[in-house]
Amino acid sequence: MALVVKDIVKNFGEGLSETKVLKGINFEVEQGEFVILNGASGSGKTTLLTILGGLLSQTSGTVLYNDAPLFDKQHRPSDLRLEDIGFIFQSSHLVPYLKVIEQLTLVGQEAGMTKQQSSTRAIQLLKNIGLEDRLNVYPHQLSGGEKQRVAIMRAFMNNPKIILADEPTASLDADRATKVVEMIRQQIKEQQMIGIMITHDRRLFEYADRVIELEDGKITD
């Protein structure tokens, strides 16, 4: 299976005020592949990632998954569940009144897992990142790095087919950033997901299978 991006164009505004943000984007990401998107501010990276996640519609072009349009005419996943697309953002966005384990189990139960299934899955994921002793604490009791690790495992809770990450290490120091990207890569490889991450940090490029450079709404060679 692959995610295929074909001739994606995105314009904002109309007439004289129209701005062309994406100008015919084409690439493929195979199952189990971890790809980094890089480019200067305003190059179209976040707009592209938002389109791939179904949060924004393109002006023209197609996104295919498993040889079928990723989204139908109502902009719903046509061959996937919404839970099959996982998002990781710059900020952790943890729910302040939920304990660490509840941040994950709630996601699992909303996707159809039983309470026992979601609890087992959450404990295993948190154990993978060394937070098994922090299950019952609240977000304000965590460090910034711990919060981000919880947010990342939350994105992987439902074994999504596609992971989209927008600068997930932007607020972390070099050591923590490396550990976070290693964690993301490991999950993508082990679960054979399709992974796309935006980052400006060139030190992290070595963890990607491929780096796609964007400039002025186009992919550069």
From Swiss-Prot:
EC number: 7.6.2.-
Keywords of this entry: ATP-binding, Cell membrane, Membrane, Nucleotide-binding, Translocase, Transport
Keyword Ribosomal protein found: no
Subcellular location: Cell membrane
UniProt-listed Gene3D superfamilies: P-loop containing nucleotide triphosphate hydrolases
PANTHER family to which the protein is assigned, alphabetical: HEMIN IMPORT ATP-BINDING PROTEIN HRTA-RELATED, IMPORT ATP-BINDING PROTEIN
Identification of the protein by name: Putative hemin import ATP-binding protein HrtA
Organism: Staphylococcus aureus (strain Mu50 / ATCC 700699)
Upper lineage: Bacteria, Bacillati, Bacillota, Bacilli, Bacillales
